[in-house]
Swiss-Prot record:
GO terms for biological process: translation. The keyword Ribosomal protein applies. Belongs to the bacterial ribosomal protein bL36 family. This is Large ribosomal subunit protein bL36. Coiled coil: none annotated. GO terms for molecular function: structural constituent of ribosome.
Amino acid sequence: MKVLSSLKSAKSRHPDCQIVRRRGKLFVICKSNPRFKARQR
């Protein structure tokens, strides 16, 4: 999982990527390609 200051580029890396808010943090999850997971500081 990458830790990024901005998730805009992480969201557009794959069509299946979606942004989710969990525990007050923003996450990018990707079911079909899990290596594109990311979290915002």
